[in-house]
């Protein structure tokens, strides 16, 4: 099937009152990304020609998050939440002439797999409407899928189901696909004569059957249909996401020495033969190339780590950190918006921000790039093969040339030419015997205070 003819409709209008939050439900973070992004990512696998997000509660924030994922996404607003069919109908003006298929997803159902959506589209060759269903361990209040042989006869919401229909374990996920024009036509015929007075998207199946059209069911694992309506379900979803991410990393040839203690983001990329130690947290935007090692208790976000580099333990890489091949970043080092060229060593207790460090330079313990003047950030440039002595303060903007050195304890406020040695500290003064005399003075003063005390 030509995937260019797929249109995606993502329903994201719900307020999520049970979340007890000012944040729209679909924007709660899951794997360090808005829950909405998970649904969009699954749908993106179909290479849709158009994507329409139906927003409602917090529409402006939802639209911003959707366009942060893909600027081409179109957003419509469902001012009143009158049901799922009503929500899909809001997309009709944008998709009235859309060719090909329409697939409806939900912003609060983050685990639908791309291969599941592919199977749904494959079933479209046999059925006019295809619904995604699952065998529920505890059917509860899910809508039931009533089938006749291999065909789907209708979907019955729990509130409207008979006692016999409630015994059915095949349940509705809400995900549906059909030819775009047909889906919108069926949606326009949906009424609200039901217990909730809502316009149910599920009614399109019965309406299709009235037209003599066939409906079918694609069945997926129940875990894919996990919806998030409460904080407890959000925690459950986070656990499921991390479980999947860890399994995928191991399958892709990554070593996780303590998998259950490593936490991934939605877009984390780890190359084959990368090694990740225990208690590592990946925030958004992290790429770790093949053969790199992240040691225990590191926190990384928005960074790129090249082959052969080692990070940690106890290191923090922030957005804009770029580590070239064979860079070593040791314990209690923080790097932000800084590029470290090949072979740079930053062993411990250092902050490098808004900086560029040339190849094979050594950064001594306690070095700080003083990049902020209270109003603006300034850059530090350090050349190749330089040696920055321990406890050096580099007051930006400042440049240290190639093969230059700074003496330990220096405060560098002026540029250092290539191959020069810079000393920016007071000269040491040594006074023989003064330590003993000072201690005697201090003890005498302390004794005098004790005598004066009442």
UniProtKB/Swiss-Prot annotation:
GO terms for biological process: cell morphogenesis; cell wall organization; lipid A biosynthetic process; peptidoglycan biosynthetic process; regulation of cell shape; UDP-N-acetylglucosamine biosynthetic process. Mg(2+) binds at residues 108, 229. Homotrimer. One of its GO terms (cellular component) is cytoplasm. Signal peptide: none annotated. One of its GO terms (molecular function) is UDP-N-acetylglucosamine diphosphorylase activity. The keyword Transmembrane helix does not apply. PROSITE patterns: HEXAPEP_TRANSFERASES. It catalyses: alpha-D-glucosamine 1-phosphate + acetyl-CoA = N-acetyl-alpha-D-glucosamine 1-phosphate + CoA + H(+); N-acetyl-alpha-D-glucosamine 1-phosphate + UTP + H(+) = UDP-N-acetyl-alpha-D-glucosamine + diphosphate. In the N-terminal section; belongs to the N-acetylglucosamine-1-phosphate uridyltransferase family. In the C-terminal section; belongs to the transferase hexapeptide repeat family. Catalyzes the last two sequential reactions in the de novo biosynthetic pathway for UDP-N-acetylglucosamine (UDP-GlcNAc). The C-terminal domain catalyzes the transfer of acetyl group from acetyl coenzyme A to glucosamine-1-phosphate (GlcN-1-P) to produce N-acetylglucosamine-1-phosphate (GlcNAc-1-P), which is converted into UDP-GlcNAc by the transfer of uridine 5-monophosphate (from uridine 5-triphosphate), a reaction catalyzed by the N-terminal domain. It holds the Pfam family NTP_transf_3. It comes from Cereibacter sphaeroides (strain ATCC 17023 / DSM 158 / JCM 6121 / CCUG 31486 / LMG 2827 / NBRC 12203 / NCIMB 8253 / ATH 2.4.1.). Residues 232-252 are annotated as: Linker. Pathway: Nucleotide-sugar biosynthesis; UDP-N-acetyl-alpha-D-glucosamine biosynthesis; N-acetyl-alpha-D-glucosamine 1-phosphate from alpha-D-glucosamine 6-phosphate (route II): step 2/2; Nucleotide-sugar biosynthesis; UDP-N-acetyl-alpha-D-glucosamine biosynthesis; UDP-N-acetyl-alpha-D-glucosamine from N-acetyl-alpha-D-glucosamine 1-phosphate: step 1/1; Bacterial outer membrane biogenesis; LPS lipid A biosynthesis. Residues 1-231 are annotated as: Pyrophosphorylase. Residues 253-454 are annotated as: N-acetyltransferase. The active site is at residue 348. NCBIfam families: glmU (TIGR01173), PRK14353.1 (NF010933). This is Bifunctional protein GlmU. InterPro entries: Bifunctional_GlmU, GlmU-like, GlmU_C_LbH, Hexapep_transf_CS, MobA-like_NTP_Trfase, Nucleotide-diphossugar_trans, Trimer_LpxA-like_sf. It is found in: Cytoplasm. Acetyl-CoA binds at residues 365, 371-372, 390, 408, 425. It comes from the Bacteria. UDP-N-acetyl-alpha-D-glucosamine binds at residues 11-14, 25, 78, 83-84, 106-108, 143, 157, 172, 229, 318, 336, 351, 362. Keywords: Acyltransferase, Cell shape, Cell wall biogenesis/degradation, Cytoplasm, Magnesium, Metal-binding, Multifunctional enzyme, Nucleotidyltransferase, Peptidoglycan synthesis, Repeat, Transferase. The keyword Repeat applies.
């Amino acid at each position: 099937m030509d995937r260019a003819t797929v249109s995606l409709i993502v329903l994201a209008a719900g307020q999520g009152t049970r979340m007890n939050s000012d944040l729209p439900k679909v924007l709660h973070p899951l794997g360090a990304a808005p829950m909405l992004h998970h649904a969009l990512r699954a749908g993106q696998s179909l290479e849709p020609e158009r994507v329409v997000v139906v927003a409602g509660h917090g529409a402006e924030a939802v639209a911003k998050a959707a366009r942060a994922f893909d600027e081409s996404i179109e957003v419509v607003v469902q001012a009143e939440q009158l049901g799922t069919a009503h929500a899909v109908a809001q997309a009709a003006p944008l998709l009235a002439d859309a060719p090909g298929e329409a697939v409806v997803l939900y912003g609060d159902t983050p685990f639908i797999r791309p291969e599941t959506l592919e199977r749904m589209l494959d079933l479209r060759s046999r059925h006019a409407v295809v619904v995604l269903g699952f065998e529920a361990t505890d059917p509860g209040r899910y809508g039931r899928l009533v089938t006749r042989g291999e065909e789907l006869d209708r979907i019955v919401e729990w509130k409207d189901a008979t006692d016999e229909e409630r015994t059915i374990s095949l349940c509705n996920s809400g995900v549906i696909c059909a030819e775009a024009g047909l889906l919108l036509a069926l949606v326009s015929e949906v009424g609200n004569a039901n217990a909730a007075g809502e316009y149910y998207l599920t009614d399109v199946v019965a309406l299709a059957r009235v037209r003599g059209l066939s409906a079918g069911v694609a069945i997926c694992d129940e875990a894919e249909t996990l919806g998030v309506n409460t904080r407890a379900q959000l925690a459950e979803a986070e656990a499921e996401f991390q479980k999947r991410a860890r399994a995928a990393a191991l399958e892709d040839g990554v070593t996780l020495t303590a998998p259950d203690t490593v936490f991934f983001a939605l877009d984390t990329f780890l190359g084959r033969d990368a090694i990740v130690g225990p208690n590592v947290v990946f925030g958004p935007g992290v790429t770790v190339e093949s053969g790199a090692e992240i040691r225990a208790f590191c926190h990384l976000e928005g960074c790129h780590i090249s082959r052969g580099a080692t990070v940690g333990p106890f290191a923090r890489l922030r957005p804009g950190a770029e580590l070239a091949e064979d860079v070593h970043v040791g314990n209690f080092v923080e790097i932000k918006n800084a590029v470290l060229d090949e072979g740079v060593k930053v062993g411990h207790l250092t902050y490098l921000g808004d900086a560029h460090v040339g190849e094979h330079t050594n950064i001594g313990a306690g070095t700080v790039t003083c990049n902020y003047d209270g109003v603006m950030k300034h850059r530090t440039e350090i050349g190749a093969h330089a040696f920055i002595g321990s406890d050096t303060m580099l007051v930006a903007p400042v440049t240290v040339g190639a093969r230059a050195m700074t003496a330990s304890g220096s405060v560098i406020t002026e540029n250092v030419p290539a191959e020069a040695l810079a000393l920016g500290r007071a000269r040491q003064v040594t006074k023989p015997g003064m330590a003993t005399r000072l201690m005697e003075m201090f003890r005498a003063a302390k004794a005098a205070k004790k005598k004066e005390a009442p």
